[in-house]
Every structure is written in C-alpha cells, then in structure tokens.
Amino acid sequence: MKASRFFIGTLKEAPADAEIVSHKLMVRAGMIRRVAGGIYNYLPIGLRSIRKVEAIVREEMNRAGAVELLMPAVQPAELWQESGRWEQYGPELLRFKDRKDNDFVIGPTHEEVVTDIARNQIKSYRQMPVNFYQIQTKFRDEIRPRFGVMRGREFIMKDAYSFDKDAEGLRESYRKMYDAYVRIFTRLGLEFRAVAADSGSIGGNFSHEFHVIADTGEDAIAYCPSSEFAANVEAAEALPLIAERAAPAEALTKVATPGKAKCEAVAELLNIPLERTIKSIVLATDNEGAEPTIWLVMLRGDHDLNEIKVSKLPGLKNHRFATEQEIVEWFGTPPGYLGPIGTKKPVKVIADRTVANMSDFVVGANEVDYHIAGVNWGRDLPEPEVADVRNVKKGDPSPDGKGAIDICRGIEVGHVFQLGTKYSEAMGATFLDESGKPQPMLMGCYGIGVTRILGAAIEQNFDDKGIIWPESIAPFEVVLCPMGYDRSDAVREAADKLYAELTAAGIDVILDDRGERPGVMFADWELIGVPHRLVIGERGLKDGKIEYQGRRDTEATLLPAGEAAATVAEKVRAALAH
C-alpha cells in the first residue's frame, strides 16, 4: 500500500467528548468518526485492524470445529416472546414495527434465532454436536453510550452457539471454545485473564469472561498471582477471615455513639479496629397480599455487600433494599444505628462467613446515637444463617488455597456460557435420542467483541505519542518513511526496492510517498501505531545504511541497506509467532 493512494485522517486534537485514551487515540489516528451517540464510521485505518481481528477469530473458530453462518440483524418479536426475553430484556433492546404493524428487534444477540434454526434443522442426536458462529453487527440501545467503541450502541461481534445431546457433550464444546479463546487472545498479542463469572441476562449456569488487563477497565478482577485462580469480583468466593470463633471476653454493653452512624466513626470513637464493627444492611422481599419479609445482612465493617451472591440465596432472588419507612417500622430507628438485638418486628438474619466467626463485636442498638459492644453469637444472639455475601478484597485468601487475592482492572472482550436447556426448553428445540425419545438440546453460547478488542488493545498499549499496536492487529506491520521521495532518485529507488522486498515476503507494509516533512510523517505513524519503521535518507544511503526503529524502542538503530528488508521481516514474524 502506498500512502498517496490510501486515506490517512489523523488529527492533532481529540474531540471534547472523548474521555478515555482509546477513544481519543482512535479518533486522532483516523480510525473512527462519530455518526451518532455510540455509532461510528470505521475509516480505512480502523477497518484494517478490524479485519485482522476477524481473521484471527475466524481461523481459530474454524480450527475448533465451528461452522460459520450469517443470521439476520432484524429479528421478529415472536422469537423473543417465546424465550421470555421480550419482557425481560428492557429498553436496551431496540424494538420497532414494520409497515404491517409487526413487532421486530435489532438483535443484540442471536440465541433466539439460532435456536429456531436448530429446532427446524436438527432432528436426531446423530446431527450433534454442532457449533454455529457468525461475525456480525449488533445493536444494544445503551442508555449512556460512552468511551468510543468500548460502550457503543452498534458494534461488531463474533457470536457462536453450540448444540449437544448431553451434559458431557456440552462440557466438551465449552472446553473447545474456552481453549479457542485462549489461542485467539494470545495471537492478538494481549495480556488477558479468563475469569469465572456470573451469567447475567444471557442466563445459564456456568460461564467465564475474558478480560484484557488495563488500569481503565470497568470490571474488577480478583486473581491469585501464585496460581491460575481468577474470577470477577462479583463471582469470587470470599472465604472466612477468621478460622475459629474465640470465646467471649467482654460483657454486653450499650455505649453512647452520638452522631456516629458509620462503622469507621464508631471504631474511631470506641478506639477499636474497624474489623470489630458490624455493617447492617436491610433488604426486603415482597409477598403478594402480605407485608414484606425483612432481612438483616451482617457484614464486617470493612467489607462490602455482593448483591449477586445475595440474589442466589433461597428466598432472595428478587430482593430489594428496604425503604426508610420499612426500616423504622421493623427496627424502630432510621439507618445508621441498626442491629439484630431488640428489633420491633421479627427479621431474618444472615451473617457473612467472617461475621459468623467473630466474637465481642459491635452492632447498632436500634436507637439513635447508641451501639451495643461485646456482642457474641450463642450468648447474646442465636446462631445465624451463614452465607458468602461479600466482595473479596486484596489480601484475602485465594479460594484455591494457593496464596492471597490481588485485584486488577479488566475490560471484558469475550464471554463463554453453558446455557444448558434455558432456550431449547422455552422454544421447543428437541431431538430424538438413541431410544427415539425427544430430548431438549443442551446449548452453549460464546461471544467476542470484535470492535471492543480494538479499544481494549489501545488501553493496554499506548504512550504519549499514540497507539502501540501488537503486530497481529496493527493496520500495517511496517511503514517506510523516505526522506525526499519526490526529490531524490536514490531515496525513491531504495524505498521502492524495500517496499517490493517486504511485500514479496508477505509483510503488510505501507510506503509514505505523500511528500510530507519528516516530523509530520513520524508523528502520523507513531500516532497510528505501526510497530516497525524504516527511514530511508540520502545521507544514510551513502553509508549503505537504513534507519530502523520499533514503535516501543526509545532509540533508532542503523541496518545495512541490503539486509534491512530481511531483518525487519524476521522481526515481524518473530512477534507474530509469540
């Protein structure tokens, strides 16, 4: 490719609405341009990187035995009504009517459509396993699209759906996709972690997220540096921090805590560690035709509630936070001084695992400006229902017993789910088993955010000059910068020769023949993030040298002119082989 025949739309300044590095750099590098909120044009530079991501994804999906198809972006409402997601999905699902007043959606995912394919095409266990995938544009009507392609409304996604006859087959399909994802993100040149996750609105009973590690990531990941353990903080098991409950050493005492409604303030006033205080959180579950059930969840003062874990407890699937009116009715006091002793009406108490092993702790007295110290289970309170209801923290013991938890930030770029029969039972997707009996198909679904990968890769790979692409997804692998291409025959001939040699070697190279000043050329290609640069100048050619600089290098080096193409081609191949 020659730059004079390409489109390079670099900008010196980022738009005012760009908040994060990837959004700023994708606009400045001429990769994207905004059309509407969360909707972008992908300019030639950006599209080249997208196509490279798609190629790697497609190769690894095919290698794993998946079969490519293409499903419509527009889907009839009837399919979503069958699955139950027409009512469940919410305003993110873009709905519209055609001229005949039929309801349709623009698909954010394709579980319903692919299940419809399967129920009409798969009749026997002999036709499974099968895994269909596509790479297609999706639409999710985000309430607040932001961060460029990281949280857009329209995006490109690879979504795959496996169908198996039994649980063993589903586990094998899931393993193949998990392994394929590891290969994909490794080939993309990204630092990533696969983490155990909650299945969210897709549903199902087992899932992993793939996160690109970046300080700007929206998701918190708990991992163990000395083992393979990693999980979304929402899903990570929090072990009890106290192995055994100590015997009571203090008497039950009501203490004045005027104006101290927070655990930190109470601990400071009483001159005790925050870890001896209890955070009381009041939840409610509604009962048709009767008053709600009120729950008191007890956490250690330095811990935070994990609502996803709570929602999985018996009776708490549809919980909500209690209103202040309900709190006063059940506890006799507003929030800030709540506790399990002396409630006005019965409440159900759940203690976090760590709280269940505490002794001589402090709780609210259910009276403004008072707490109770020296509280102990068994003596002052009945033994509680115990559950893991908190988020893990840095330093907690790893659930695999191999060290301590650390926390990092990640950007989710892939997700794999074992759906089981969630959609096949709802939509009647059955097959005849070996004995001729109809059985529901077992499904898995597997997504990769193709356009999101670009933003995530930039968040992980940039400096003050611009993007630093991994070779595998860079719009070009090598850029040739000739000094005076339009003025010097020697420079032009050397640049054209290098271009021909690199092209023949299969290297994705661009020759900057625009006639720009060196400073402009260098700034453009550093901003765009091409991994390798060769500078051809008359002075160097007289000495038989060509200047080379890798995008991550701080200094340039001189290469023999006759060896420059082979040397750089080998650098590219070595990087792609990692």
Curated annotation (Swiss-Prot):
This is Proline--tRNA ligase. Belongs to the class-II aminoacyl-tRNA synthetase family. ProS type 1 subfamily. Its main location: cytoplasm. Keywords: Aminoacyl-tRNA synthetase, ATP-binding, Cytoplasm, Ligase, Nucleotide-binding, Protein biosynthesis. Homodimer. InterPro entries: aa-tRNA-synt_IIb, aa-tRNA-synth_II, aa-tRNA-synth_II/BPL/LPL, Anticodon-bd, Anticodon-bd_dom_sf, Pro-tRNA-ligase_IIa, Pro-tRNA-synth_IIa_bac-type, Pro-tRNA-Synthase_IIa_type1. It is an enzyme of class 6 (ligase). Consists of three domains: the N-terminal catalytic domain, the editing domain and the C-terminal anticodon-binding domain. GO terms for biological process: prolyl-tRNA aminoacylation. The lineage of its organism: Bacteria, Pseudomonadati, Pseudomonadota, Betaproteobacteria, Burkholderiales. It catalyses: tRNA(Pro) + L-proline + ATP = L-prolyl-tRNA(Pro) + AMP + diphosphate. Catalyzes the attachment of proline to tRNA(Pro) in a two-step reaction: proline is first activated by ATP to form Pro-AMP and then transferred to the acceptor end of tRNA(Pro). As ProRS can inadvertently accommodate and process non-cognate amino acids such as alanine and cysteine, to avoid such errors it has two additional distinct editing activities against alanine. One activity is designated as 'pretransfer' editing and involves the tRNA(Pro)-independent hydrolysis of activated Ala-AMP. HAMAP family: Pro_tRNA_synth_type1. Its EC number is 6.1.1.15. It is found in: Cytoplasm. Pfam families: HGTP_anticodon, tRNA-synt_2b, tRNA_edit.
